[in-house]
Amino acid sequence: MRRRRGIVGIEAAIVLIAFVIVAAALAFVALNMGLFTTQKSKEVMQRGLEEATSALEVDGSVIARAIDADTTTGSYNIVVDALAVPLKISPGREGIDLDPSKLTVRLLLPNGFYENVYCGYASGSAGEDFEAVLSNAPTGCEPYTTSPGPFVATDAYVYVINGDGDSVLELGEKGLLIIRLDSDTTATIDVDYLEPYDKIMIELRAVSGASLTLERVIPPTLPPLDSTSDATTGTTTYAVAPVDLG
C-alpha cells in the first residue's frame, strides 16, 4: 500500500499566513493607487473649473460719465466718454495680478475694435468722486490735464479702493475698471465716445481663468448738459453728469 504524505497543521498555517500577507500587500497597493488616482482626478477637475470660470465678477452697476462735447453755448452734443465697472474677486479665487503684463482689456466700440487698452492700476480710497478717479490715472496712461474735460486717447486702468498697495486685487478688496474714451473733438483723429443706443463690449482676460465679458447699451436719453466757451477769456467749461448703465 502506497504511503501519502499530508500537510501538517504548522505547514498549512505558514502557507495561509503567506497568502494573507501577499493579499494584504496587494490590497494596500491597489488602495494606494486608487487614492492617488482620486486625488489627481480632483486636482484636474479643480484646475478645469478654475480655467472655466473667471477670477473676476461685476460687483454692482456700471456708471458712465456724460459730457457735452460741444462747447458752443446753447448747442449740445451729449455723449458718454467714460465708464466705471465695479469689480471683485470671485468666490474661491485667491486674487488676480493687475500688472499690465498679466491683464488685458479688449474693447469693441461702434467705431472699431481695440485688442488691448489696459495701461495699469492705481490705488485710492472710498469716498472719491468720479472726476477724482478719472484724474488719478497711473503712470503709463494718457494724462488727464483738464478736469472736467475730454480725453485725448482711449485707455483703461483698474482703480483699487482700500487695497494694501500691491499689484494683486485680493478677496475683500474692491476695484473699479475705468474705461476712458477719446472725446477730443478738436483732434483730427476719430473719436470713440458713445451716443444713445450705441453698444460697448468689454472683455477682461487674466493669465488664468476664463475671461470676463460684459456689454452695455447707452440709454436713448442722456442728462441735459450745456458746456460753454468764453471767446473773450478763452475759458472753456465742460458740463458732465453720471449715468447708470445697470
From Swiss-Prot:
<comment type="function">
    <text>Flagellin is the subunit protein which polymerizes to form the filaments of archaeal flagella.</text>
</comment>
<dbReference type="GO" id="GO:0005198">
    <property type="term" value="F:structural molecule activity"/>
</dbReference>
<dbReference type="InterPro" id="IPR013373">
    <property type="entry name" value="Flagellin/pilin_N_arc"/>
</dbReference>
<keyword id="KW-0974">Archaeal flagellum</keyword>
<dbReference type="Pfam" id="PF01917">
    <property type="entry name" value="Arch_flagellin"/>
</dbReference>
<dbReference type="GO" id="GO:0097589">
    <property type="term" value="C:archaeal-type flagellum"/>
</dbReference>
<comment type="similarity">
    <text>Belongs to the archaeal flagellin family.</text>
</comment>
<dbReference type="InterPro" id="IPR002774">
    <property type="entry name" value="Flagellin_arc"/>
</dbReference>
<feature type="propeptide">
    <location>
        <begin position="1"/>
        <end position="6"/>
    </location>
</feature>
<protein>
    <recommendedName>
        <fullName>Probable flagellin 2</fullName>
    </recommendedName>
</protein>
<dbReference type="GO" id="GO:0097588">
    <property type="term" value="P:archaeal or bacterial-type flagellum-dependent cell motility"/>
</dbReference>
